[in-house]
Regions:
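Beta-sheet entry/capping signal
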Residues: 62, 88-90, 125, 167-170
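Short glycine/serine/threonine-rich phosphate/pyrophosphate-binding segments
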Residues: 73-76, 100
Length: 221
């Protein structure tokens, strides 16, 4: 069984120098001095580092996140803030235009309120854009299912355009689960410059969100 005599901090750059002399027994670190493995906490730290490194690789200091008011996009915004700082994160808010009933109007108002609340708690600025009416653009009636798919494509286009305009990196909230189950629907659409949750199952995001909310309760659960 080995003994740990020195350790660098986890998920941080550091220079660790430990002198070792032949025949000299060094004191080992106590168990309480060693980091305790907590999968969700370490996963979050790894994701923060991944966003920071990818932004550097893209030559960008800022990131754009499409805010939808749901868990994945809210958690992604919090991740970007932890990685780059709130002043370097922009939230894109895309309105919905296919609202026909009072219930839909109420749901959209609640969604917009949730999005603005998340942006306020994270101290990030938002860019609001309106989605074009698919039926008018295509000059035909569009079913609800087609309209939702077209909105997803439009959101990707708006995300790409906003990122290009601001010289920022576009982040995608897609998880490993969505890449596996919705691959045909994703083909042909813009999915951002980087998807931090691409190797994280959708079911894991809830547990990661709880870890992030211990710092400050910004992510809806």
């Amino acid at each position: 069984c080995g003994r740990v005599v020195a350790q660098a901090p986890c998920f941080e750059e550091s220079l660790l120098v430990q002198e070792i002399q032949r025949g000299v027994m060094l004191d080992a670190l106590e168990d309480h001095e060693l980091p305790e493995f907590r999968s969700e906490e370490w996963l979050w730290q790894a994701l923060v580092l991944a966003v920071r490194d990818n932004a550097r690789a893209h030559g960008a200091s800022r990131a754009v996140v499409a805010l939808e008011g749901d868990l994945p996009s809210s958690l992604l915004a919090a991740l970007a803030v932890d990685a780059l700082g709130p002043r370097n994160v922009i939230g894109l808010v895309l309105g919905r235009n296919r609202i026909f009933t009072p219930a839909q109007e109420e749901a959209e108002a609640a969604r917009c309120a949730a999005v603005r609340a998340i942006a306020e708690r994270l101290h990030i600025r938002t860019v609001e854009r309106d989605a074009p009416d698919a039926a008018r653009v295509l000059d035909r009636d569009v079913s609800a299912g087609d309209a939702e798919r077209l909105r997803s494509r439009t959101l990707g286009l708006m995300l790409e355009d906003t990122a290009l305009e601001l010289g920022a990196m576009a982040l995608s909230p897609l998880s490993k689960t969505e890449y596996a189950l919705a691959a045909p629907a994703l083909c042909g659409g813009y999915q951002g410059d980087f998807a931090p949750f691409g190797d994280v199952y959708l079911s894991t995001l809830e547990f990661v969100a709880r870890v992030r909310n211990r710092t400050s309760a910004v992510v809806p659960q």
